Amino acid sequence: MMAEPTRRRVRGAASYQRGLQAEQVAGAWLQEHGWTILMHRARTRWGEIDLVAQRGAMIVFCEVKCRPHYTTAAESLGRAQMRRLMNAAAWLCAAHPGWIYDEMRFDVLLVTAGDAVHHIADAFRLE
């Protein structure tokens, strides 16, 4: 007989599914705005970048956040996570020498209730 999943595990699975859905919504939003998705869920030893996209000579590394409200989503990216994203982006650029770009930046896409997308371009910078 299998044990019932714990409440924490059920909540975690639901959060994971919401996150996947938010990434799909964010990716579609980027494409509607002229971006080409280069990678989805790009994994590195420093962590995962949700979306890597390019438009013209600009590459963006996107973190997707899914929250019920804009303010809580905007506040959910900490300094340690920013550092991990920067390290992961540097590794991805080195691992993909075929990517041609003049500029790169870090964007945050906030997906809130009703799949509304709020785009924060150049959300943080390399220090």
From Swiss-Prot:
Top-level taxon in the UniProt lineage: Bacteria
Gene3D superfamilies assigned to the protein according to its UniProt record, in alphabetical order: 3.40.1350.10
Protein name, entry field: UPF0102 protein GDI1964/Gdia_0189
UniProt cross-references to InterPro entries, sorted A to Z: Restrct_endonuc-II-like, tRNA_endonuc-like_dom_sf, UPF0102_YraN-like
GO molecular function: nucleic acid binding
UniProt family annotation: Belongs to the UPF0102 family.
Regions that span the bilayer: none
